[in-house]
Structures are given as C-alpha cells and as structure tokens.
C-alpha cells in the first residue's frame, strides 16, 4: 500500500534534481573567434572572448555542454571538431566528419543549423556527440549533379563518445565516428533531442530525406542507442533549399515545432515522451511580409525566408524568426485571427546590408536570444519577456553585446536540448494503449509494430520467449530489449510467465 507514495516521492526528487541542471549555463558563440556567454542570474549575461585561434566557425551547427552542478564549460563542438574548455582541440577530437564535409570551402559542415548535438551518457562523466554529415561518395555525386535550388542532402548520422575523466578533466574522444544511420538521404539541418518520460534517457529526432515526411528517432540510453524508428507524418514534405531551419521542443516536452527556410509556415505537433511519436500535426501559415527597409532595392522589399523557431518558457507561445520579422504564435488561442502577433518588423540596425535574423534559443535567464545569419558585429538581439503576449514580449535591440576591439562576430546560439526538463509523473505506457488498458495491464511491449527491437516493460529479469505463428520457439532471453532485426516481417507471439502478447515485425 506504500508503493505509490514512495514512487511519487522518488519521481519528485528526480524531477527536482533535473530542474537544477546547469549543463546549458554557458554558451560558445562567434565566427572567426569564439566567446563564452556566461549566464549568472536574471541580469544580462557576461560575454568573454576567450578562443583566440581561428577558424572556429561557431556559427550555426555548433553545440556545447557544461558541468551539471557548477555550470562550468566542459567542451564544445563546431560540427566538425571538438574543443576542450581551454579552446584547444580535444584529444582525438579532430576530423569528426568525412574529408569533403570538413574541407568544403564555402559551407563546411560547421555552418549547418543543428548539425551537432551533445547529450550526457549517464552520470559517469561520458557524453554522446551526434553529428549529421555527408559521405565523400554522396558529396562527389551531388557536387557534380546538383538538385538545384541549393539542395544538398546529407546521408550520414554519426556519434562519438567523450570521456571527461581523461586528461585531467579536459576529456578525450574514446569512440569516434560511429555510424548511427547511413545510406539514407537526410536534411542537413534540424536535429534535436528531448528527455524521455523517465527523466534519464533521451529521444533524438532527425528529419529524413527531401520530399518526404519521414522523421527518424532514436532512444538514447546510457548503455546503448535504440533505433532508428521511423514515423511518416502527414506533412511537411520539405524539398527546397535547406541551409536554414530549426526544430524545437516545448520546455514541458509535450510539443514540437519546425520551420524551413523557404516555406512560409510553422509545423506544430504533439510529442509523446514515452514513445517518441508525434501526433495531431498542423500547419500554421506565416505571412510573407515586407522587410521594413527604407528605400529598399527590389530584392530586399519582401521577407520570404524563415530561419528559427523557439517556445516561450511557459510553453504558451511559439516564436518564429524570418530574415526581417519576428512573430509570436499563441498555439492554444481559439481565435486564429488573434493567435499571431508580429514582435519585430525590420532590421535591428541601420547598417545595411543587415545580416538577417536566424535561429532562436531559450537562455537560462528566461530570455530568447536571436541569432544572425552571418553576423558582422558583436551583438545579438533579445526577447526579454517571451512569456508575455504581444508587445509586452519586449524586443531588445542588440542587448547581448561585447563592446571591445576583439575581431569576431556573433552569429547564432548553440544547439542545445532542454537539460532542465525532468522526469514526468505517472507510468510510461505506449501511446497506442488506452488509459483503461494501461490500468489493467501488468506488462507491456513497445514499440509494436517494430522493425528493430521490442522493449518489454515491468518484466525485468523474467524469461521472454518469442514464437512464430506455427508455435515454434525461436529464442528465449531475460533481456528487456529484444533485437528482432534478423527476423522476417510478420506476426509473432511473445510469452512471459504464461502470458502471451501478439507482436508485429514490419
């Protein structure tokens, strides 16, 4: 009778612990040289130019991670190279992508939005570093046979493992260029992660190939990575130029939003932290507005490119950045005519050519920071009160600043997941089961159907037997994760302690 109260106490403690996570407390930003943005409290963050050896390319595809307790910077990634906390290339941290992606002169791998992401690998000082890139074979083909309209698909998703216990805390790459997904065309942008319902594991999402609605997801655990699981959505099927665009989860982990640079729309859907699946998708039209530039040349009259997306800390609003305009969308407003508000119209500088608003990111101080496509200055504009509807959101022009003579420029915030999202309350059941089924069930198998693995919940240490439809025993195991990639498609029966469930391999 005391199990449920004790479980709730444990879950509460876990959630409180994760809510105090400081892994995103400092940011690395800047092109040509790097700077650390140090968030202290609710006052303006401090900017310190510390990385003095170019080229660093902390422009669009970069990421970093800090100590969960102190907020001290541990290491950073620019999409191609890992740097330790001193700005020196980490031991075995160079050449994390194939040679052509590394050396491409105009757009190396470091310049693609959300092309790298860092996640903790448990609590032992190890970390996963995920990078989306392109093989030399694919590069050579598309460079001589371009798709047109700036499209250049990637076909390789890699991960590396960093051990921060090595080299006196400066870290070392102990597993390098491990293949997670290959021989599949992928968008070169949009990769993000959200904590699993259990507060320990992560769901990693990566958008699939051009012209499809495929979303690849992986369950990232301390001991292994499961997947890929593939979900086909009703929309969007992006097939145009994809240098810019972003994917973002809401702070409570229940929503996902995406934008694509040449599509005048916002994709919005519910997200299930148990299954990693998206549901109830919808498309919100974003106006093709004027740039707001006085006496503009013809190519600068209309604003038709979207760069970034971000949720407000209270989950109620989605912010969308175009090159010259920033919009606030209230997703739960029943009157659609009142749901969209333009927070900013026109550039944040009188100097032209203005370098355009780009990706957005929540800061640890509750503000939203607005990146620049190819910044020429050491400033970044900020939304000071993103939880407030309309004009009260408070666009603050170039309020993140570095006023010294350092030769560098601010571009975009790093690609970070929400480390502050904790475990959710209740038991994590598959999305397909109704609440009544959940209450009566003693154990469950998910995902079902599956093409890779079945995960058995609430039967730890028990023998699991898999039978074909002829009743022949195929194998037995006590593991909770059952690998079925070697089996043919079709229906099977999973037996655990005299109870049988039907499972489908697809």
Residue ranges and their predicted role:
Residues 3-10, 417, 462, 483:
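Terminal low-complexity, poorly structured segments
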Residues 437-446, 450-506:
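C-terminal outer-membrane/trafficking sorting elements
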Residues 20-433:
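Beta-propeller fold recognition
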Residues 15, 19, 343, 456-459, ...:
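Intrinsically disordered, low-complexity regions enriched in polar/acidic and amide residues
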Residues 6-9, 17, 54, 149, ...:
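Generic marker of residues within folded, mature protein domains
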Residues 1-25, 255, 290-292, 304-307, ...:
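Bacterial Sec-dependent N-terminal signal peptides
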């Amino acid at each position: 009778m005391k199990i449920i109260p004790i479980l709730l106490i444990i879950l509460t403690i876990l959630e409180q612990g994760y809510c105090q996570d400081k892994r995103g407390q400092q940011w690395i930003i800047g092109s040509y040289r790097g700077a650390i943005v140090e968030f202290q409290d609710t006052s303006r963050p401090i900017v310190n130019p510390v990385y003095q050896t170019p080229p660093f390319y902390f422009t669009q595809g970069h990421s970093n991670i800090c100590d969960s307790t102190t907020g001290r910077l541990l290491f950073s990634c620019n999409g191609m190279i890992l740097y330790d906390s001193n700005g020196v290339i980490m031991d075995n941290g160079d050449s994390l992508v194939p040679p052509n992606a590394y050396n491409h002169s105009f757009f190396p791998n470091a310049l693609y939005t959300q092309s790298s992401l860092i996640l903790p690998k448990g609590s032992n000082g190890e970390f996963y570093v995920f990078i989306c890139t392109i093989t030399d074979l694919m590069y050579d083909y598309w460079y001589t046979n371009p798709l047109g309209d700036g499209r250049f698909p990637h076909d390789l998703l890699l991960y590396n493992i960093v051990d921060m216990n090595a080299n006196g805390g400066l870290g070392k790459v102990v597993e390098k260029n491990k293949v997670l997904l290959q021989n599949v065309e992928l968008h070169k942008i949009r990769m993000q992660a959200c904590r699993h319902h259990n507060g320990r594991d992560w769901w990693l999402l990566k958008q699939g190939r051009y012209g499809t609605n495929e979303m690849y997801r992986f369950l990232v655990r301390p001991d292994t990575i499961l997947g890929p699981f593939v979900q086909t959505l009703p929309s969007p099927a992006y097939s145009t130029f994809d240098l810019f665009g972003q994917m973002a989860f809401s702070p409570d982990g229940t929503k996902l939003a995406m934008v694509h640079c040449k599509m005048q729309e916002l994709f919005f859907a519910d997200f299930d932290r148990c299954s990693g699946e998206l549901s109830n998708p919808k498309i919100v039209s974003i106006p093709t507005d004027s740039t707001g530039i006085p006496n503009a040349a013809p190519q600068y009259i209309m604003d038709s490119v979207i760069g970034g997306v971000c949720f407000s800390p209270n989950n109620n609003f989605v912010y969308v950045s175009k090159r010259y305009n920033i919009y606030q969308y209230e997703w739960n407003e029943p009157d659609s005519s009142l749901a969209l508000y333009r927070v900013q119209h026109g550039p944040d500088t009188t100097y032209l050519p203005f370098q355009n608003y780009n990706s957005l990111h929540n800061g640890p101080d509750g503000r939203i920071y607005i990146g620049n496509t190819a910044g020429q200055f050491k400033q970044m504009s900020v939304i000071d009160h993103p939880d407030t509807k309309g004009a009260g959101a408070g666009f603050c022009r170039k309020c993140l600043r570095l006023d010294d003579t350092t030769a560098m420029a601010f571009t975009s915030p790093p690609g970070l997941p929400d480390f502050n999202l904790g475990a959710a309350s209740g038991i994590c059941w598959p999305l397909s089961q109704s609440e009544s089924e959940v209450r009566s069930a003693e154990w469950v198998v998910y995902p079902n159907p599956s093409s890779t693995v079945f995960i058995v919940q609430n039967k730890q240490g028990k023998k699991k037997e898999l039978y074909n439809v002829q009743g022949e025993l195929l194998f037995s195991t006590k593991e909770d994760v059952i690998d079925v990639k070697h089996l043919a498609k079709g229906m099977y029966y999973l037996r655990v302690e005299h109870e049988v469930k039907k499972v489908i391999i697809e």
